[in-house]
Each structure stands twice: as structure tokens, then as C-alpha cells.
Amino acid sequence: MHKSQKSFYAPFLTLLFGGMLLFATETAVAQTDTSFWFAAPEVANSHGDRPIGLKFTSQGLAAQVKISLPANPAVNPMLVNVPASGVSSINLSTWIDSIENFPANTILNKGIHISSSTPITAYYEVVVTNNPDIFALKGRNALGTSFMIPGQDIMANAHGRNAFDIVATEDQTTITIIPTDTLEGGRMPGVPFTIVLNKGETFSCRSHGTNTYDKLIGSRVTSDKPIAITLIDDSVRGGSIYNGGCFDLLGDQLIPIQQLGMEFIVQRGFLDVHNNNSNTRTERVIVMAVENGTQVFLDGSATAVTTLSAGQTYHRRMGNNLPVTYIRTSKPAYVMHITGFGCETGWAVIPAIQCTGSSLVGFMRSTSERFGFTVITRTNNINSFSLNGNAYGISFTAVPGTNNEWHYARVERAANDTAEFNTSTGYILSNSTGNFHLGIIN
């Protein structure tokens, strides 16, 4: 068991190599919406920070999508047309200096707003070969007034830092931040500070160091009006654990505390892991409590493996002999998954299974590197999948501890195996009888 807490706690898809994209809709982490707010992270140029772009999938009806920077009228809005049940993308690299949130500790005008004429799913991606990741945009369910920052403390940074970026959705938004580590600009751990942002303005909180202990886990952010937060951990040394020279970007858009759940299913991805779950070289599921007295239960057991205080984390290790785990918490919690391919790492905020999922998800394969996806659905839905309108058979297995209510599956294609999933086609995975959760690793 790995259980950690910062030394001071103040009371108060497509991407190359290691990224993970999780799709789910409604309740906890809805991603099908007509309005999205996003703060694009500053990614280390020294390790590669471009191309960057957005991808959109329509939900049965054609969509006209507008991308704007509300606080920066010098950047003209961009329009993207998405065909019915189709996928479209836009390269934003030309505007990278107007989009990425740099410097830290400064009020900026770089918030992105996406509006659509009909419901869509959307994600932002960094598509550089050696430092990619994807950020699933969560629409209205990314917006809230109370957040705690989750994260990892097992991999140091080779380039860049651990950071979180805030975007305001309304004028005169007062935001209070309590960091758990020293920030660039001299903000001290445990010392609250307040900023005021207008609609579309952003603020980046960036750790001052690159060590495993220079993380912002457990930091608090509260506001009087809805905000959205992007979390990154740039160029982490995955090779230090998973055998190799890999440095990779980890990132996702957070959900606020009021959207958190208490039941989660996580599938192991494709990292180079050990057979023994107690070995360091395993994938990690990281549970972070937001309330004191949060118990963590595994795989249907009635006995808690640990009890966490707010800001503490529990690491569930997943070796080759643990393909899936069912996690239940006694109080709402953040759950993150570190996964990827080989030693190339990515992470994602895991949606609670109380979230009903989606009956239709679109994705694209960016390159011919290794590609895979994971699927979780209720038992009644396992024989009802279609890919681009054609029946699609997937081999499912029951999730232990769920009384046969949930099943999981994974599909993997080797590098350069593009017979089924190529890099020029948009794909729609759908289910005719129910909803599902889809994770993309590419």
C-alpha cells in the first residue's frame, strides 16, 4: 500500500504513446454538451509542445462549433463544421502563444470557450511524438466552486512542472487558493491567497520544483462563481519505474468536488508492468480523499484497506495479474489512473460508475503507434456494440466484486497495424441497448 499526504495541509484520441481519454456522460463527468470551458496548459517547449488541437464528435446531428477566447478579442473566433455522427478536428498550433497558460502566477487572457449548435463531445490534445496527452473536456460538469487537486508523487519531472490552470466563466469571479507546495512566484504552502478573474481570464499555479515531493496534491481552490481547472504533470520520468528513457506529459480536466462519486471500475492499460502487484513497476490507481474519514474498499470486500483524511492518497497497484479493479469509497473521492504503453505514461480522472456512460462515442487514431481501448458496460449490453454502424464483437469478462453486474473488455492493436483503425478515419463506437464507458490509449 502506498499512502501519502503532503507535509502541510491547511484546514479550511487520440494521442501518441501514453495518453488516456475517458468518455462518459451525465451525472458525474458528463462530456456531451453544447458549451465547454478550458484552460490550455503550458507544456515544456524544451521537450515538445506542439502540434496542439481540438477534436469534436457530433451526437447524431450535424454541429457548427465556435472556438473563442472571450478575454482576448484580438483572436478571432474559429468555426468548425462537424457532420452528423461524425468527427472533425482543428489544429491550434498557430495560436499556441495565445492559448497556453504562461507565465505562472499572472492573470492571463487565455481561456478557451467552445460552443456548439448541437450536443458534441470534445477533447484537447498535445500531439507531439515524445510528449503527448489528451484532455477530455467535461462541459458543464467541469464547472464548480470547490476543487481539491489530485495527483501522483512517484515520478519526478524531467521538463516542466506539476501545475493547475484556472479559467473563470463569469466576470468578477473571486477565487481563493491554498497550495500545498511552494509555487512559482513565491506563493507559500498553506498560505491562502485570493485572485479576481473576469470571464475568460486564467491563472496558472505551478510548482517551484521537479522532485517527487514538489507536487500540488491536496491543494484547495474555491470560488464564488463557476470555474474550470486543468491539471498537468509535465514530462514525468516514467522510465524510472517502467524501464526506459520515457518522459511524458500527464494531464486532464478536473471535475469539482460536488461531482465526485464513490464507485469506480479501473482497467489496467498497457504499461510494462510486473506480475506482482506489490512491485513498484505497476500501473497505479490513486484515490484521494476530500473528506476526513474516507474508507477505501477493493473488489467487493466489506473490509476497508485504509481510511484517509482529506488530501491523503491511497495507491492501488495493478500488475499483470490484476487486469481490473472495483473500488468503492465511503465518501466522494477523486480517482486517477496512471496508464499508457511500455514506459510511456498518461493519466485520466476516472468517472464514477454511477455516471450512466454514453451510448455513442467518437474517436480518431492520431498515428500508427500502438493503439488500444478499454470498455466497461453493464452485462445486458455486451452483445450490442457497433463500430461505424456495423456489428462489432468484443470479448467481455465480468468485473470481480460487482455481482456480475458489470463487464469489461480491452482491444489492442500493434504499431503499424492499421487494418481496422487507421489514422485518416473517424470512428463511432455505439451500443443499441445501453451505455458504456470508453477509455482510449494511443
Feature locations, PLM:
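Extracellular lectin-like interaction modules
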Residues: 31-442
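Bacterial N-terminal signal peptides
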Residues: 11-24
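N-terminal secretory signal peptides that target proteins for export/translocation
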Residues: 1-10
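Sec/Tat signal peptide C-region and signal peptidase I cleavage site
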Residues: 25-30
